[in-house]
Amino acid sequence: MKAEQQQQSIAPGSATFPSQMPRPPPVTEQAITTEAELLAKNQITPNDVLALPGITQGFLCSPSANVYNIEFTKFQIRDLDTEHVLFEIAKPENETEENLQAQAESARYVRYRFAPNFLKLKTVGATVEFKVGDVPITHFRMIERHFFKDRLLKCFDFEFGFCMPNSRNNCEHIYEFPQLSQQLMDDMINNPNETRSDSFYFVENKLVMHNKADYSYDA
């Protein structure tokens, strides 16, 4: 009975692709130096991003770093307790090359909006569908770090497994959300878009993609 009530009360989320990122939260001089040092490196590794003290101010690699032509085509979030789909988005088929390049740039920064009770969910399944280019991928890894202002909420670390060349792949990652205090949830609801995430994608321990998102919980 409780699961049925929860399923009915959680409205589907939404996503937009703003042309500009909001001004990042204040950071220490050390954080700026750390990010600058990473940008000066020839190769950024998982250990590098895990050592960052906060959300990044910008992107740590350009779209051209994606030499494997990894393209995410579908994304869905569902509540595993109720099987209720909370959010779903898919790229249209048969896009022109010019449109694909523009989408690759705009999709690097997404703004999500969910209902307040999204913060009370315990376990969520995130299904992604993606394509790869002519080169097989043997070690594809994602590290996703979520912050509220300057506080680290959770760090997720997922492996995608082997991907054949010119293949379309899909997998579901399980997100176990941290238990948040009522005061923290209220702060996150009352400060839309101050909850942010960095999603870092690595192939053979080298950063090839970096996406950013912010979140509001006032839908």
UniProtKB/Swiss-Prot annotation:
Tissue expression from the record: Predominantly neuron-specific.
Residue sites binding tetradecanoate per the record: 112
Record-level Gene Ontology MF annotations: lipid binding
Pfam family, one: GMP_PDE_delta
GO cellular component terms attached to this protein's record: axon; cilium
InterPro entries hit by this protein: Ig_E-set, PDE6D_unc-119_myristoyl-bd, PDED_dom, PDED_dom_sf
Biased composition (Polar residues): 1-19
Phenotype of null mutants: Worms exhibit diverse nervous system defects including defects in feeding behavior and chemosensation. Phenotypes are due to defects in protein trafficking, such as mislocalization of odr-3 and gpa-13 proteins in olfactory neurons.
Record keywords: Cilium biogenesis/degradation, Developmental protein, Lipid-binding, Protein transport, Transport
Region annotated Disordered, chain positions: 1-27
Family: Belongs to the PDE6D/unc-119 family.
Entry comment, domain topic: Adopts an immunoglobulin-like beta-sandwich fold forming a hydrophobic cavity that capture N-terminally myristoylated target peptides. Phe residues within the hydrophobic beta sandwich are required for myristate binding.
Function: Myristoyl-binding protein that acts as a cargo adapter: specifically binds the myristoyl moiety of a subset of N-terminally myristoylated proteins and is required for their localization. Plays a key role in ciliary membrane localization of proteins. Required for the establishment or function of the nervous system.
Name the UniProt record assigns to this protein: Protein unc-119
